[in-house]
């Protein structure tokens, strides 16, 4: 089939959605202008970089970051644009929180964090083992 259905391939461009990455506080300050660009369907927040842009890298509970996210949500909803977010911590409650706020594009944690978190949990369970237990 490869190479024989060019019309089908060409027409798929109608289904492509353009999502921009928002990783700096200045992008949120200019979000209306960014989302007004023809062809942009939504945006995606990178929380590490966004928090870093305000000098609070990784501080996801910072008040200034919370205000930026509320502004992001308000503008995105007003402009009827899809919202995305990278939920770093592998916690289903944080995932549901974003879904309930209207986020429809979500990255859930990342491989090294997931593996490391689970490994640390399991190692705590086995820290009392002796050689006789193995």
Can you describe what each PLM-predicted range is?
Residues 1-134:
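Expand to "…catalyze enediolate/carbanion chemistry for C-C bond making/breaking, isomerization
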